[in-house]
Amino acid sequence: MDRVTVSSLKEMKEAGQKIAMITAYDYPSALFAEEAGAEVLLVGDSLGMVVLGYDSTVPVTMEEMLHHVKAVVRGSKRSMVVADMPFMSYQASYTDALYNAGRFLKEGGAQAVKLEGGGEIAELVAKLVTAGIPVMGHIGLTPQSVNALGGYKVQGKDLKTAQKLLDDAKALADAGAFAIVLECVPAALAAKITESIPIPTIGIGSGVNCDGQVLVYHDVLGMYPRMLPKFVKRYADLSSLIKEAIRQYVQEVKEQQFPEEKHSFTMAPEILERIY
């Protein structure tokens, strides 16, 4: 079965078909997400927070990302796998960016990379695309720049920042990006950006009129009993199910209810008798 491609996503936009993207961080999450029909699996640097326990995405390294990208690729056959470029893997120089992005495709097996930033990285995006590396953009609330942005806030609510986001989207599209994530952008502005560029927009907290949507795997499944951003919809409460299952296991071990006879293996009694 052929994987979803850059062309596939553009055709979906042109046909008015919505794109479903979700994060995946390992073999089982990739397997489940693909079987559920997601066209795109994003190996997000959000793994730093939901998998590795960091306070933000900033500490995530290339080696950590590559480890998880490889697992997601092994767990999928049809979905496009997009690898997040972690903080400082592309900001220092074009050489760094090309080398690291190339590793995601060559070593990791990903089909594309995602970079945070607007017009200021357009030239870099163009160079990566020229080198044969498909690039997904990411504007609005960019988590790697959360310190510079003053926290996790909606972006583009005033005239100056709204115009900049539109200009950024156009610059990335002109540079050859095949899609752009719009994070925490007012819905009306996201709709205007979506209709102003020829490539798909993938929204997260940016309204229903984007060409697609993305959410974090763990948030969708309710795997952490934590406060969620306004834009997250929790479709399950796995944290309760997981804790209850493990609680029952622990209790049965302590009360010698597990393992039962059906969980154990047997041997001939005469063999046991001959052991001394």
From Swiss-Prot:
Catalysed reaction equations from the record: 3-methyl-2-oxobutanoate + (6R)-5,10-methylene-5,6,7,8-tetrahydrofolate + H2O = 2-dehydropantoate + (6S)-5,6,7,8-tetrahydrofolate
Return the broad EC class. Answer: transferase
Q: What are the names of the required cofactors?
A: Mg(2+)
Query: Mainly localized where?
Result: cytoplasm
Which positions are catalytic residues? E183
Q: By its UniProt entry, which NCBIfam families does this protein fall under?
A: panB, PRK00311.1
Free-text function comment from the UniProt entry: Catalyzes the reversible reaction in which hydroxymethyl group from 5,10-methylenetetrahydrofolate is transferred onto alpha-ketoisovalerate to form ketopantoate.
The UniProt entry, under PANTHER family, shows: 3-METHYL-2-OXOBUTANOATE HYDROXYMETHYLTRANSFERASE (PTHR20881:SF0)
Query: What protein does this entry describe?
Result: 3-methyl-2-oxobutanoate hydroxymethyltransferase
- Gene name, Swiss-Prot/TrEMBL: panB
